[in-house]
């Protein structure tokens, strides 16, 4: 049983997947599935896979793709509860795994686990994974998972102890979930620090303990996996081979599963209801949806993305010399939010899988604030007044407001997707009504979410004024997610040139007040108090208009009706239990 500090888990709202109609059994299969008995499995991830090292990845699609190979100590299940993967059991105070003072957590590892190359998995690999990510020169994109960790110790080959700098009310961040799996020390030993990006073989074909191993990888195109002969569960995985093909768009992925049946699984179907509903009616496949904490938002760039700045473009500096010329004004940010009609957006573009929201932490219900709901009502005239009173006026009659020679002209970027382009068009219209000129840019999704350090078009580079994407917490406790807005000493948590733009604070917002409140939150044990502090952190983000939350989204994918075993998950990788997937019998 969990101790009382984890009662927050009981407050999570229900989430689940659609029930598929019973299809005809697949012919020529053994009565009982075994390892590699069910042939090939095909998937479309229209945001193509860029890298398979989750610590260098910046997009959900890459974390999912890596999760077939690399495993954490524990996954988070569809209800948000931790379940053992490489760990023997979930550590708690009751079983002695979590210390009474909450300053350490100890995992006992499963025995006789092998890497896919046949080498034994040990606690040394866990320790190395921490050392790899926290190395100051490693551009580790998920370092916030190790926030507050002071030491990771191999007590013996099958026991690892994690020590925190203060009581950790939610100690399950490090090494758990898709963002924090274990990598092999032997393979990555020479890939530490500045060398991390140079290890192309390790980063595209990691050796893992999971049900599959990489057979072929072509960046931004295709990944082919084959079953791992050393996987510890003797009759898994059931599919002999898995192919993840990239490219196209969400509607095309939906069509390939639901209309033509040529693909088994289509991920992230951000498709308008009017388009996807007729496909579902054909009865070939099923839409799987679940609700966690995913929020579509417009992020504000607090730094100047002007190309004329060269190496300082969108680069945070402690002295504020690269601050954004007009988005640094909170009145401008607030006016942009006031001008948006989130209800129209939700109704037209999302249907039952999306609700308007003013919070970046929109779920689970226990941590959802009600302090920002004024944004649910569009206020165009109020936005105009706010800009006028702040000195932003259209003095030359060209329809664009200006102040001190600076015009309100915004470059608004996002990934290529019909729903996102229609969202852009709506927002462009609403912003132009208040005197803000808006240019739209869309980038191929595999590039936008790819994290290529050589590309100027990745969302972590953020070379636009605002950008739009969806994100949310990866467990029912949002501590790791909320760490994404920490500034830290010398801006260490901010994505900037010195870390290859690979930290998690993409907006480049730096608030000592937020950092101090987060420290209090991280040290608070009582679940009700933690929930209130999580709301306060959300409110600081919302009321400073660090980003503009738009839609509280469900995760939506589709599977062909001959596929079973899927347990749709919004708190972790959708492929977290892929070893159990099989053909219907």
Which residues does each predicted region cover?
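N-terminal lobe/hinge region of extracytoplasmic solute-binding protein
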Residues: 41-98, 131, 207-208
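Mature extracytoplasmic/periplasmic domains
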Residues: 191, 353-372, 556-560
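Bacterial N-terminal signal peptides that target proteins for export
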Residues: 1-2
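Extracytoplasmic/periplasmic ligand-capture domains
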Residues: 7-10, 14-34, 76-78, 95-96, ...
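Surface-exposed binding/hinge segments that line
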Residues: 108, 142-192, 216
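Short aromatic-glycine motifs in intrinsically disordered, low-complexity regions
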Residues: 72-81, 140-141, 195-204, 364
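Active-site-proximal polar cores
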Residues: 550
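General beta-strand recognition
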Residues: 42, 83, 106, 159-161, ...
């Amino acid at each position: 049983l969990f101790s009382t500090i984890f009662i927050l888990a009981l407050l999570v709202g229900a989430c689940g997947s659609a029930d598929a109609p019973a299809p005809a059994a697949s012919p020529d299969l053994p009565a009982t599935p075994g390892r590699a008995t069910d042939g090939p499995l095909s998937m479309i991830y229209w945001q193509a896979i860029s890298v398979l090292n989750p610590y260098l990845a910046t997009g959900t699609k890459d974390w999912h793709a890596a999760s077939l190979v690399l495993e954490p100590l524990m996954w988070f299940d569809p209800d948000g509860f931790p379940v053992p993967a490489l760990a023997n059991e979930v550590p708690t105070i009751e079983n002695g795994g979590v210390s009474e003072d909450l300053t350490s957590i100890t995992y006992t590892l499963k025995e006789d686990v092998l890497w896919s190359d046949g080498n034994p998995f040990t606690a040394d690999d866990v320790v190395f994974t921490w050392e790899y990510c926290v190395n100051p020169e490693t551009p580790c994109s998920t370092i916030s998972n190790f926030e507050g960790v002071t030491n990771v110790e191999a007590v013996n080959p099958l026991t690892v102890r994690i020590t925190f700098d203060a009581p950790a009310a939610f100690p399950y961040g490090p090494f758990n979930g898709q963002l924090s799996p274990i990598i092999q020390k032997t393979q990555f030993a020479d890939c530490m620090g500045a060398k991390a990006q140079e290890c192309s073989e390790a980063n595209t074909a990691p050796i893992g303990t999971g049900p599959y191993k990489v057979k072929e990888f072509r960046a931004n195109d295709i990944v082919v996996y084959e079953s791992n002969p050393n996987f510890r569960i003797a009759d898994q995985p059931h599919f002999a081979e898995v192919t993840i093909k990239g490219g196209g768009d969400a509607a095309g992925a939906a069509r390939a599963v639901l209309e033509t049946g040529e693909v088994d699984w289509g991920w992230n179907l951000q498709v308008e209801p009017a388009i996807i509903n007729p496909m579902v009616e054909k009865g070939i496949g099923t839409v799987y949806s679940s609700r966690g904490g995913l929020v579509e938002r417009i992020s504000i760039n607090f730094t100047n993305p002007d190309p004329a700045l060269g190496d300082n473009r969108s680069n945070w500096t402690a002295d504020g010399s690269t601050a954004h010329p007009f988005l640094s004004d909170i009145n401008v940010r607030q006016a942009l939010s006031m001008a948006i009609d989130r209800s129209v957006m939700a109704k037209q573009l999302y249907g039952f899988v999306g609700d308007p929201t003013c919070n970046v932490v929109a779920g689970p219900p226990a941590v959802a604030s009600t302090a920002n709901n004024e944004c649910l009502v569009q206020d165009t005239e109020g936005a105009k007044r706010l800009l006028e009173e702040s000195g932003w006026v259209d003095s030359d009659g060209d329809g664009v407001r200006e102040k001190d020679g600076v015009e309100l002209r915004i470059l608004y970027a996002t990934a290529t997707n019909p729903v996102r382009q229609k969202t852009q068009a709506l927002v462009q219209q609403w912003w132009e009504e208040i005197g803000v000129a808006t240019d739209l840019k869309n980038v191929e999704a595999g590039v936008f979410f790819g994290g290529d350090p050589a590309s100027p078009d990745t969302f972590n580079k953020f070379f636009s004024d605002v950008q739009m994407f969806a994100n949310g917490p990866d467990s029912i406790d949002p501590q790791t997610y909320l760490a994404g807005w920490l500034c830290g000493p010398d801006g260490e948590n901010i994505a900037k040139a010195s870390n290859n733009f690979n930290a998690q604070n993409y907006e480049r917002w730096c608030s000592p007040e937020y950092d101090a409140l987060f420290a209090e939150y991280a040290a608070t044990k009582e679940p009700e108090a933690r929930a209130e502090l999580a709301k306060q952190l959300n409110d600081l983000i919302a009321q400073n208009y660090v980003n503009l939350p738009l839609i509280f989204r469900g995760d939506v994918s589709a599977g062909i009706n001959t596929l079973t075993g899927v347990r749709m998950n919004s708190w972790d990788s959708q492929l977290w239990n892929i070893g159990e997937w099989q053909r219907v019998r």
